[in-house]
């Protein structure tokens, strides 16, 4: 009996010891908002500040950390943007310690330096929203948000400013949830300084209609929402960056803004002739390819937001852009033709000049809690000028296997002609001009009918576009395999002047209604009628019988047309002139079911689209006045399952019916260009495309582990492909649209990022992409041969891996990218490709307490697997930047940048399709140095804010402040012209 009692006592003591694990717990809240704060770093330290254990607060602000033994400890709590706090605690008798609520106050914004001790996590995921913490990405001094976006996991930024997040193109930029420069993502990327940004959110935003009705219209847009740092959204902010460099490079930028509770006004100016490339350091996206051509641009933009909470929202933006381009390119192509190939080379010089104005307004009024009125007008005006000149040639054999000379040089052409490889050669010149005016508007009124989800919406849209364009084209061609009666190679020329006025307008009315069937279940109905009209009336004047010469300059029409003054009408070619008029009547009828549950949302439905079209066409002596009636069907399904606030699964399906254009259906042959003849096909069927997407993400608090994966699949039945008939004698081709089956593609991606340690000092990020494309097309070798179905299968693997270390004054990273492409061609197995492109290298950011900052990156980029040995190259691209802050608070920064110090960056690209392989090389200035002078003046409102302003991304503790980022640019095109 005594043994039993003793055993029970020992068991109870053991259970008590297990129950009391010296667990320290609590909840972190914001002093001002009283809301829980997630992602707060909690560190348990010994009395001598030695690290013991750590944790991160969850989405409810809760945390727990276990003490290894009884004793006295320090509990350090820190988060970017908040004052750090240290609690002295004591654990005794192995008891747990409940801290209760721990309140954090916002960090005072110091111009002399923000006191930040924790290393912020790089990315978190909340359902289908990616939240990037800008302070975790250290960008060079003077940089704008483009440099920040390039460093984000899953992000891609192309040379033209196109942004992709997890494979989806970003269509809109928001600042603090408000629209910014509507319709223009580039202005934000090139002008917003990184140092005012606290967080970036990436998510799919529903359309204006979907937001108020809940009806999924398939018009979602991927957006980036830049959150401004606390304390910087009240007062004045300004940043001026003036940069000049060698090789006549310049890059200048100015930005100013005024913020208060309800108003936000921002003004930008930018001028550069560096393609606004920014600093080339850091990030795993480095590799082959500099800027394509020489480009100069100037921009002035303004954006204004006003908001009266729950009552009124007003956004407007105005933008002026001017650009000059000088693009020289050398192109080499192989065109797959049946069991053989044709080859072509070209040398092209293009000059361009563009001028545009754009204005947008978004006005939203909520007169009461049941009504929402939205009005969106916009207007734009633009002109563009172009000059072009090119030399090209076609061959029936690979020219590089016959001659070592340039295949476009006189010596090379003579050698190829003697070998019987020449098919044709051409010299072309052209001048173009266009003037485009556009105005559009949208009015939407939504009314809730009770509180159960019943609502009705009426919407009208209208658009008007007027365009005038002119062009002169001169072409001289030589056919080496077609002989004249005298036994010489055939030649011909075309000299034409085109005037093309066009007009387009449309209007639409839409009614939507949502009816609650039972709890959280809705039946939604939408009807939309659209009328669209377009007219084009091209007048073509043919001077092919005469030699035309003139001044090859912008709008230099008169110098070419003066010899024909007063008699221009006599040269109008009625056959080559083309008139077209198009009227389209469309009815969209959509029915959807919507289920809303605590764990999942489900939408499914179908849209039926009856369409009637009237087409009038006069061309090549043919007059057509035809009417077509078709019906398109588009089923859709969208399912979202919410595992938690940090984990989300989404499945999306959409089917789309597409009709061939009426011009494709007309049985007309267009032989205005003898080397490029096109035909219509009245037997074309509509195509049906099915798109499937699966998306999953999860975020684990422990070590900030983030996981994202998605799979996209697309297939098209009765896809429309051009059947190409190649003429071996002339090198010309005849194209005719045909239906074909077998076009499909699948792609998948996996992203993983984590902090290796609890303090976020060591980090790992990886992106994996796999894609497979099955391209099909028709090919035939001559007019007598039956067309053959050609299939090109392409497999792509892309990998990006980044490993980094960061502390208060230093960040080191090792980045690597891998691109593998395996392409097979059914009819041309000799053209199969297994190519590798990989890039890797270190980057460093170092900041000293006295305001000196050093950035350096080295990228080793390699190509392997190309049949042309000259393509299998290695490039060492080294960029560096040194900056120093001056004056009290460091408002002035002097910065020196060095681009491509080793002068090895190339401008080569390759494109592959079912019918061809094309390699292109561009002109560019990639290697230069630039000196920047940056000054900022910031006056923030509020008691704490008046003390100063926070550091930029990657803030370091106790360092005296650094200025905001910037840069200006522009330049006059130079280069060659034929």
Q: Which stretches of residues belong to each language-model region?
A:
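Short, acidic Ser/Thr/Gly-rich low-complexity loop/linker segments typical of extracellular
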Residues: 47-62
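A short, amphipathic beta-strand motif
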Residues: 22-30, 61, 100-102
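Short, ordered, surface-exposed loop/turn motifs in non-cytosolic proteins
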Residues: 32-46, 125
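Membrane-proximal, glycine/serine-rich, low-complexity loop/turn segments characteristic
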Residues: 20, 60-64, 76, 82-85, ...
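Conserved C-terminal beta-signal and adjacent last beta-strands/turns
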Residues: 798-820, 832-978
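Short Pro-Gly-centered beta-turn/loop motif in secreted/extracellular proteins
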Residues: 37-38, 64-72, 80
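Extracellular/periplasm-exposed beta-strand and loop segments of Gram-negative cell-envelope proteins
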Residues: 280, 288-294, 327-335, 342-358, ...
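Face-selective signature of the C-terminal outer-membrane beta-barrel domain
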Residues: 317-319, 358-384, 423-616, 704-716, ...
